[in-house]
Design a protein with these regions (language model features):
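Glycine-rich phosphate/pyrophosphate-handling loop used in enzymes and phosphotransfer proteins
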Residues: 1-167, 171-201
């Protein structure tokens, strides 16, 4: 609806997570915390139009928004995709109960679309969310990390594979870190992420 107003995040941005920054190489969060993933980026800043857009996509089933998001990921992350050379695209899973409630897994929908555009293998079931956790929205960074301990389980062979994790929004990185840790414990190579949006802080 407001596609023309949207601008992807340009430079300077954090070398690790891709958050917009004013100077330097890393955002404050990546200076303070050692993340489990290698690198990643979000395409748009999570505010205003995009916050409303993602809410409609996630909670009201507006899948046409997902089509636009996946096209934007493919269009604006060409350089990263070439550099990262992922072998497999994997979405952040949601617990069964949440998927029933929403009617779909919004990250899995994005992953499948991106896989179609890129030709990269996609597996939406290889990581499962086995614990029903509290919503991350109202938790601080430490609580988010604790909340996700042992939440994910890898059900297939990821040994030696470079993995691209897909989600809708990156805030503190705790979800991506939990996913990356789980994948690496099962022998995955490098883990990267792409999200539709990323917070400023």
């Amino acid at each position: 609806e407001c596609e023309k107003e949207l601008r992807p995040i340009g430079h300077p941005r954090c070398y690790k997570c891709g958050k917009p920054i004013e100077t330097g190489e890393y955002c404050r969060d990546c200076q303070k915390h050692r993340h489990m993933y290698e690198q990643g980026r979000g395409i748009f800043v999570y505010d205003g139009i995009m916050r409303r857009s993602v809410t409609r996509y996630k909670y009201y089933g507006c899948r046409e928004y997902g089509d636009f998001y996946a096209r934007a990921m493919y269009r604006y992350a060409q350089k990263e995709l070439r550099e990262w050379k992922p072998d497999l695209i994997v979405p952040v899973p949601v617990h069964r109960s949440k998927e029933r409630q929403r009617g779909f897994n919004q990250a899995a929908y994005l992953a499948e679309k991106l896989g179609h555009y890129t030709g990269i293998s996609t597996d939406v079931n290889i990581v499962q969310k086995v614990l029903k956790t509290k919503s991350q929205k109202k938790l601080n960074a430490l609580q988010r990390r604790k909340n996700l301990e042992k939440a994910f389980c890898v059900t297939g062979d990821v040994r030696g594979k470079n993995i691209l994790v897909i989600d809708d929004v990156y805030t503190t990185g705790s979800t991506i870190d939990a996913m990356a840790g789980c994948l690496k414990r099962k022998g995955a190579g490098n883990v990267y992420f792409l999200t539709v949006c990323i917070g400023r802080r």
